[in-house]
């Protein structure tokens, strides 16, 4: 199982997204994603997302908020468990990201991007403030179904 984080950094009605267009053999090639990545040994989810956001964007996050958990069984040959965060407080200047092109996307345009099918489903839950635990099943690049539990 691969443990990872994902964060949607918010500022002035926009969300920082990365267009994954720089790395060879990237499973997310051509897609738009929030920032995040895999845990390093001994990290908490919060430590992981703060480190990943800094490495990918140059921004230092303060008090990222855990808003959901995602499970992707057998996605590209691995089971992925992803801690989803939002962040409103940060400092720093954007860098030339090694992951792709960074862009502040107006929130109303987020679902118009080339996203994974699952993102179209769970991203509105984030905006509604619903804490969720969801499993999304893919066959190749096609989502086959999902289950979700909401927590109050």
Please name every model-derived segment:
Residues 1-17, 38:
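Conserved N-terminal beta-strand and adjoining loop/helix that marks the start
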Residues 15-19, 23-41, 49-50:
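N-terminal first-folded block
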